[in-house]
Amino acid sequence: MKSSQPVSRHPNNEEDFFGPRKMAPGIWQFNVWAPKPNDLTLLLKRTNEVVQFPMEKSADGFFTVTVGDDGAINHGDQYCFCIDGQNNRPDVAARCYVDDVHGWCSVVDQDQYCWNDDRWQGVAKDDLVIYEMHIGTFTQAGTYLGAIERLPELVALGVTAVEILPIAQTPGRWNWGYDGVGLFAAENTYGRPTNSSSLSMRVINKVWL
């Protein structure tokens, strides 16, 4: 299997990385800490089949596999893990879940989104007017994009900062966000990962700047 140094990512670039890790275009490393199972297999959905990739276990309980040589992995590809040849389980460190936290996960290429937050300076403490926002109830749509459309109204009210209630992936359709299960993934009923990134940037550009 080919491997290389990880490319730059926003906002982190740690050496030890849970979940899918982009090593080079089309080449990804999958990491799971699971000390109890004897075997772990990566299952990757292709057009007409599910391809299996056995993972290598280290002495400290990490299972790892790097794939891409036999077919590039792309943004949005679906995957999960098979434990000891019997039980299919989602990635607890997935960046996106296809349906809910019990099913397939989706690869998220953070390089797909162009961050332009270099000008962000923050707001002086004395100038803070904070609006606490729950994405699901802030608009009729209940989505990240729906929230973006109403940001000008907050600016007109004098709001200078937005505090978003927790958006970690939860089971079910309705949730306040305080019992998130997929802690590395943004709630998919509000939209896709690029939508949540867009909301972050629009808040910075419309409210904070």
Where are these regions (language model features)?
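Cationic, amphipathic, low-complexity alpha-helical segments enriched
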Residues: 194, 199-209
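Aromatic-lined carbohydrate-binding/catalytic grooves of carbohydrate-active enzymes
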Residues: 153-198
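Short, well-ordered coil/turn segments that N-cap beta-strands
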Residues: 127, 158-160, 206-208
